[in-house]
């Protein structure tokens, strides 16, 4: 598995949601983990722990949504598109509908909006231009809120455990609050050996501005959220907003939950909720072969062993003016089959114009890498130019295997050389495609 640090760094480059709570470098960062559940799933789980959430139900058709609204028997309704991405409220559907969260006053309204959401693609600032297809909508009761606040529990590497993070400015982009008004962010580190303490939750409840009569209720909800976080091996429990309603209730209006994939064996029921249709299919495919893959936006594919070397390879590609198309770590002991599948995966990305293979053989043997590359090239007739830099165990055997293969592999002896060749080739291929030209490369470059 990727380390949290590597995942955080890579996913930040994908413009995924991350939170830095200090002006300077902070260790308080959360990121998308292996499992991220839908809002309706999150609220169902939370309710079983006594956490207050709005009444609601999920629908997969406009007719189901209408029936749910009829049963709720109220004119104060909300229909929410269910996608694993933030920014729904300001998103745009391929149907032309603006906003993935719509207020409704009747069951007919709910059906109308559900029909414009279900089966359509929602594009938000977090989905990228491809967006995500909506397969469910969540129909809930609407509440009139007296005050909206932000509350989260996440893992803090610096503190060595969980920390509660809260702000009186909820219902908005919390990253913007942290950037523009860091004094509005409050933190309470938790000693995992004794758990969250009443004085901690009271301090936060008072700083958030709960009315005096609701301080104890807010404390109770914070304690239950912490219990949920610990018992389910969460990496993030985010409530935005945590609200005080006009009727005097304390409600978790919207929830984002992430679970530690390393604890999947302890929570099979939770991990069955994984919605692969909302994930990058390349990442799903990579997981089948125990490959650590994260798709990016560039045009230079990367196949590397070791997360640190992979990060360095991506950095040097950027240094020479290129842009990596992915992070792919085959690990320290990959098989020929894994290498073959890694090459297939990278080459399946139409944006990729060149591929950099950078292997330092320790436990991983260079000849295994060479055999995997050749197998993939022969099986798929891959035309994408490959720049291969190998060093370490069995490197001479690997070079001979590649020379004897008769395939047009571009060799490099050091990382600078490999990166420069990869960037140059990607530029040439991109220009040729724009000009509708066919090109070939004469070796050595």
Swiss-Prot record:
Residues holding ATP: 80, 87-89
Presequence boundaries: 1-17
Amino-acid positions noted as binding Mg(2+) in the UniProt annotation, renumbered to this chain: 240, 254
Q: Can you say what this protein is called? A: Succinate--CoA ligase [ADP-forming] subunit beta, mitochondrial
Assembly with partners or alone? Heterodimer of an alpha and a beta subunit. The beta subunit determines specificity for ATP.
Which residues are in the ATP-grasp domain?
A: 43-270
Claim: Phosphoprotein is one of the keywords in the record: no
Q: Which reaction does it catalyse?
A: succinate + ATP + CoA = succinyl-CoA + ADP + phosphate
Protein's job: ATP-specific succinyl-CoA synthetase functions in the citric acid cycle (TCA), coupling the hydrolysis of succinyl-CoA to the synthesis of ATP and thus represents the only step of substrate-level phosphorylation in the TCA. The beta subunit provides nucleotide specificity of the enzyme and binds the substrate succinate, while the binding sites for coenzyme A and phosphate are found in the alpha subunit.
Query: Could you tell me which pathway this protein works in?
Result: Carbohydrate metabolism; tricarboxylic acid cycle; succinate from succinyl-CoA (ligase route): step 1/1
Q: Magnesium as a keyword? A: yes
Q: Which InterPro entries match?
A: ATP-grasp, ATP-grasp_succ-CoA_synth-type, ATP_grasp_subdomain_1, Succ-CoA_synthase_bsu_CS, SUCC_ACL_C, Succ_CoA_betaA_euk, Succ_CoA_ligase-like_bsu, Succinyl-CoA_synth-like
Question: A cellular component term (GO) from this record?
Answer: succinate-CoA ligase complex
Q: Which Pfam families match?
A: ATP-grasp_2, Ligase_CoA
Query: Could you tell me the Gene Ontology terms of the biological process aspect for this record?
Result: succinyl-CoA metabolic process; tricarboxylic acid cycle
Question: What's a Gene Ontology MF term here?
Answer: magnesium ion binding
Name the source's superkingdom.
Answer: Eukaryota
Q: Site feature Important for substrate specificity: at which residues?
A: 76, 144
Q: Which cofactor does it need?
A: Mg(2+)
HAMAP family registered for this protein in UniProt: Succ_CoA_beta, Succ_CoA_betaA_euk
What are the EC numbers? 6.2.1.5
């Amino acid at each position: 598995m990727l380390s949290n640090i590597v995942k955080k760094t890579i996913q930040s480059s994908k413009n995924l949601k991350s939170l830095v709570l200090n002006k300077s470098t902070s260790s308080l960062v959360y990121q998308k983990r292996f499992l991220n559940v839908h809002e309706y799933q999150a609220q169902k789980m939370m309710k079983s722990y006594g956490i207050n959430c709005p009444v609601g139900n999920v629908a997969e058709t406009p007719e189901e949504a209408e029936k749910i609204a009829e049963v709720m028997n109220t004119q104060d309704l909300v229909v929410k598109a269910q996608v694993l991405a933030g920014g729904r409220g300001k998103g745009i559907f391929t149907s032309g509908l603006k906003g993935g969260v719509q207020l409704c006053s009747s069951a007919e309204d709910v059906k109308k909006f559900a029909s414009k959401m279900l089966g359509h693609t929602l594009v938000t600032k977090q989905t990228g231009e491809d967006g995500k297809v909506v397969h469910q909508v969540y129909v809930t009761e609407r509440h009139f809120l007296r005050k909206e606040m932000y509350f989260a529990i996440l893992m803090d590497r610096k503190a060595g455990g969980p920390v509660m993070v809260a702000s009186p400015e909820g219902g908005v982009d919390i990253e913007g609050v942290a950037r523009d008004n860091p004094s509005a962010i409050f933190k309470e580190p938790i000693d995992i050996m004794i758990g969250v303490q009443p004085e901690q939750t009271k301090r936060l409840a008072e700083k958030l501005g709960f009315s005096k009569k609701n301080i104890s209720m807010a404390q109770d909800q914070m304690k239950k959220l912490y219990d949920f976080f610990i018992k389910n091996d969460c990496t993030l429990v985010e409530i935005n907003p945590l609200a005080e309603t006009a009727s005097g209730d304390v409600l978790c209006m919207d929830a984002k939950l992430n679970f530690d994939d390393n604890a999947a064996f302890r929570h099979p029921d939770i991990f069955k909720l994984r919605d692969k249709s909302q994930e990058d299919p390349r990442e799903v495919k990579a997981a089948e072969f125990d490959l650590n893959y994260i798709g990016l936006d560039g045009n230079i594919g990367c196949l590397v062993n070791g997360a640190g070397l992979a990060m360095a390879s991506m950095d040097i590609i950027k240094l020479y003016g290129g842009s990596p198309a992915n992070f792919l770590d085959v690990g320290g002991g990959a098989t020929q089959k894994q290498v073959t599948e890694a090459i297939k995966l990278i080459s399946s990305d139409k944006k990729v114009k060149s591929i950099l293979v950078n292997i330092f053989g320790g436990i991983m043997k260079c000849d295994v890498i060479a055999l995997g590359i050749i197998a993939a090239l022969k099986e798929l007739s891959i035309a994408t130019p490959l720049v291969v830099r190998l060093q370490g165990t069995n490197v001479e055997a690997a070079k001979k295997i590649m020379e004897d293969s008769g395939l047009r592999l571009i060799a490099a002896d050091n990382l600078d050389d490999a990166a420069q060749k990869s960037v140059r080739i990607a530029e040439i291929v991109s220009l040729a495609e724009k000009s509708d030209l066919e090109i070939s490369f004469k070796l050595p470059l």
